[in-house]
C-alpha cells in the first residue's frame, strides 16, 4: 500500500521518528507505539519479509533476535563498563596524555577508528563516547558525537571482522583484500570529518588540564575495563575466523561482555543501580531498531559505482543488513566500494547505524535528525569525497562473488 508513491511502512516509521524528535518527554512510549503500529500493519495487510501472518512475524523475530539481544547486552554492559572507566579516574589524566588543542579530539577519533577494525562498532562508539564525556566535562558537541559514530563505522568498513556487512561479504566469498580497499575512502573521510568535528569541539569545549589533586588512576578498575574489552574483541575475532555461522545464531558479543562483567564483579563491583535506567533506554533503542528492520527493501538498481554511492545515503535511513544481502544476491559490485558505502553511510543520521542508536543512550540530545544533520554536515561531505578518492585511485572493478552463502547472508553474521 502506498501514499503518494511511498510505502505506508515508511510513512509510519517517519511519523515515529518525528514523534521521537518532538515529544521529548515520552520518547519511549512513542517508539513502542510506532513499533507496535508498524508490526500490526504488516501483520494484517502486507506480511513480513519472511512471510505473511503470525508465522511471518515469528520468522522475522527469529531472524532479528540475535541483533536485538547483542545490542541489549552491549548497551547494558557498556553502561556498567563506562562506570568502571569513570571510577578509574583515567579521564582525569587524559588531558595530560592528549594534545590540549583540537588535535586531542582528533586523536580520540583516530583511536575509535582503529578500535573498530577489531571491535564491534557499537562498542567502539560507546567507548569513544564515554571517553569524550569525561574528557570534555560532559559538554560534547553534537557534530563531535556524530564524528565518533562515523569513526567507528569507517574503521570497521575495511575489515572483515570489524563490521557485520563486511563479514557477510566475506562469508559469501569476497576476499578480505577486496574489502580492505574501503580503508582508502575511510581514512580520507576521517581526515575530513575528524578535523572539522575536532575543531568544532575545541571551540565548544576544549580539553582542560585540570587533574583533581590527589586523584590517581585505579589500576584494578582499569584492568577490569581492559578485560571486558578483550573479551568482546576476542570472541568477535575468534568466531569470525573459526565459526562465523554461530554469530548469526547466538548473541556472542553481548553475552561475552555481560559474562566478563559478572566474572570481575567480585573483584570490583559495578554500579548495579545503573541497570534500570540503562534498560529503559535500551528498550527505546531496540524499538527503533525493530522498526528499521521492518522497512521493505525488495530490489536494487543495476550494480555500478553510482548505485554503490547511493546505497550509502540509503543506509543512513534503512538497515544496511538487508541492503547488503540484496547486493550480495545481485552480485557484480566492487566490494571495497560497497563495504565503504554501506558501512560508513549510516553515520549521516543518528539512527542510520546501531552505533548511532547506541551512543544516543549516552548523549540523548543526539536523537534529533535536524540537529545531527546541521551539526554533522561534514560527515556527508566526507563520505562523498572519500568515495570519489577511491574511484580516482582504484577505479571501479567488479568482482564475481562466491554465491555459496548468499542465499542466507544476513543469517550468518551479527547485526550492526
Model-derived regions: residue spans:
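Interfacial loop-to-helix junctions that mark the boundaries of transmembrane helices
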Residues: 1-5, 22-27, 51-71, 99, ...
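Long, contiguous bundles of hydrophobic transmembrane helices that form the permeation core
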Residues: 190-261, 403
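Hydrophobic transmembrane alpha-helices that form the pore/transport pathway of multi-pass ion
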Residues: 104-157, 168-172, 325-340, 365, ...
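Transmembrane helical segments that form the transport core of multi-pass membrane transport proteins
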Residues: 228-333, 410-415
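Juxtamembrane and boundary regions of transmembrane helices in multi-pass small-molecule transporters
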Residues: 2, 87-90, 138-142, 146, ...
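Membrane-interfacial loop-to-helix junctions in multi-pass transporters
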Residues: 5-10, 67-71, 97-110, 136-146, ...
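Helix-loop-helix module between adjacent transmembrane segments
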Residues: 78-83, 111-123, 150-159, 185-194, ...
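Hydrophobic mid-bilayer segments of alpha-helices in multi-pass membrane transport proteins
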Residues: 7-17, 24-51, 68-80, 221-231, ...
Amino acid at each position: 500500500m502506498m501514499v503518494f508513491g511511498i510505502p505506508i511502512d515508511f510513512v509510519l516509521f517517519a511519523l515515529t521518528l518525528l514523534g521521537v524528535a518532538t515529544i521529548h518527554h515520552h520518547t519511549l512510549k512513542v517508539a513502542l507505539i510506532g513499533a507496535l503500529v508498524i508490526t500490526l500493519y504488516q501483520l494484517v495487510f502486507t506480511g513480513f519479509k519472511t512471510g505473511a501472518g503470525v508465522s511471518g512475524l515469528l520468522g522475522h523475530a527469529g531472524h532479528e533476535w540475535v541483533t536485538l539481544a547483542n545490542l541489549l547486552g552491549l548497551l547494558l554492559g557498556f553502561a556498567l563498563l563506562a562506570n568502571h572507566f569513570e571510577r578509574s579516574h583515567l579521564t582525569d589524566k587524559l588531558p595530560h596524555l592528549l594534545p590540549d588543542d583540537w588535535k586531542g579530539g582528533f586523536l580520540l577519533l583516530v583511536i575509535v577508528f582503529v578500535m573498530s577494525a577489531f571491535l564491534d562498532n557499537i562498542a567502539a562508539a560507546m567507548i569513544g563516547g564515554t571517553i569524550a564525556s569525561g574528557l570534555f566535562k560532559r559538554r560534547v558537541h553534537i557534530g563531535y558525537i556524530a564524528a565518533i559514530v562515523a569513526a567507528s563505522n569507517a574503521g570497521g568498513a575495511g575489515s572483515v571482522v570489524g563490521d557485520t556487512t563486511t563479514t557477510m561479504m566475506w562469508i559469501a566469498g569476497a576476499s578480505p583484500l577486496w574489502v580492505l580497499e574501503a580503508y582508502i575512502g575511510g581514512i580520507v573521510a576521517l581526515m575530513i570529518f575528524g578535523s572539522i568535528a575536532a575543531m568544532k569541539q575545541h571551540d565548544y569545549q576544549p580539553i582542560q588540564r585540570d587533574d583533581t589533586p590527589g586523584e590517581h588512576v585505579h589500576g584494578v578498575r582499569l584492568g577490569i575495563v581492559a578485560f571486558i574489552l578483550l573479551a568482546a574483541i576476542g570472541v568477535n575475532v575468534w568466531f569470525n575466523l573459526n565459526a562465523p555461522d554461530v554469530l548469526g545464531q547466538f548473541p556472542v558479543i553481548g553475552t561475552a561482555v555481560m559474562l566478563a562483567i559478572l566474572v570481575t564483579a567480585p573483584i570490583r563491583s559495578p554500579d548495579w543501580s545503573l541497570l534500570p535506567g540503562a534498560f529503559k533506554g535500551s528498550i527505546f533503542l531496540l524499538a527503533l531498531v525493530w522498526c528499521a528492520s521492518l522497512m521493505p527493501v525488495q530490489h536494487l538498481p543495476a550494480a555500478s559505482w553510482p548505485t554503490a554511492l547511493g546505497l550509502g545515503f540509503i543506509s543512513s535511513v534503512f538497515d544496511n543488513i538487508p541492503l547488503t544481502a540484496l547486493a550480495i544476491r545481485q552480485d557484480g559490485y566492487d566490494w571495497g566500494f560497497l563495504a565503504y558505502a554501506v558501512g560508513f553511510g549510516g553515520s549521516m543520521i543518528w539512527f542510520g547505524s546501531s552505533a548511532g542508536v547506541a551512543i544516543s543512550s549516552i548523549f540523548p540530545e543526539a536523537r534529533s535528525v535536524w540537529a545531527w544533520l546541521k551539526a554533522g554536515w561534514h560527515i556527508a561531505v566526507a563520505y562523498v569525497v572519500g568515495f570519489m578518492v577511491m574511484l580516482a585511485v582504484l577505479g571501479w572493478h567488479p568482482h564475481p562473488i562466491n554465491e555459496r552463502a548468499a542465499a542466507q547472508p544476513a543469517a550468518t553474521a551479527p547485526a550492526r
